[in-house]
Regions:
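A generic structural signal for short
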Residues: 9, 41, 76-77
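A broad structural signal for alpha-helix termini and local helix breaks/kinks
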Residues: 13-14, 95
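A generic secondary-structure signal marking the coil-to-beta-strand transition
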Residues: 5, 17, 35, 143-145, ...
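Short, small-residue-biased leader/transition segments that mark boundaries at the very start
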Residues: 2-9
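Membrane-interfacial amphipathic helices and adjacent loop/beta segments
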Residues: 14-51
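Non-catalytic C-terminal accessory region of glycerolipid acyltransferases
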Residues: 47-178
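Short His-Asn-centered micro-motif
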Residues: 3, 21-24, 66-68
Length: 178
């Protein structure tokens, strides 16, 4: 079955110990729950965000995260990530964990990108587009995506020669060249 193939693919990498740090709204897709570490960045539980990230890095799971903290956005007709946050650099050094650059080539619907842009124009701070993430995932069922995995970057690379934000940009540049 499709689910068995997905689990087989996941289990072939790092013995199945791969987790995605995702917005907790995606936990409503029950098939994703075992693969994810839910992150709540809004509301009353937002104060737990640092603890949730810390727990993910302290685990023995390999973590896949989205360093921009949001899905890519379409700006001037180009779909790109927003600025990457430095969290993954700081935590990689603290936890002595290497960073493996991964480029996932995919896209959301025009509705999603237009909604995100409309909210930005209207000055709406709440990320309304995230409410549609589960729907966007379902729209992409049965589609093929290209995932390119780069060479691991040792955590020791992230020294004081650049700021954590500078290193985040460095890794972003590597990912976009994959």
């Amino acid at each position: 079955s499709r689910r068995q193939r997905q689990m087989c693919i996941r289990d072939s990498f790092y013995g199945g110990k791969v987790k995605y740090m995702v917005n907790d709204l995606l936990m409503n897709l029950h098939g994703l729950a075992p693969l994810c570490i839910p992150i709540n960045k809004t509301g009353k539980q937002a104060k737990d965000f640092p603890r949730m990230v810390e727990a993910g890095f302290a685990s023995d799971n390999q973590l896949i995260m989205f360093p921009a903290g949001l899905c890519s956005r379409r700006q001037n007709g180009v779909i790109r990530d927003l600025d990457w946050k430095k969290t993954f650099i700081v935590k990689s050094v603290e936890a002595h964990r290497d960073v493996v650059p991964i480029h996932f080539e995919g896209r959301n619907s025009n509705f999603f990108y237009n909604l995100a842009n409309l909210c930005k124009i209207l000055g709406i701070k709440f990320n309304i587009a995230m409410l549609y993430l589960a729907d966007e995932m379902l729209k992409n069922r049965h589609k093929t995506f290209t995932i390119t995995i780069g060479k691991p970057i040792p955590w020791q690379t992230f020294d004081k020669s650049k700021s954590p934000a500078g290193w985040a940009q460095y890794v972003k540049d590597i990912v976009y060249k994959l």
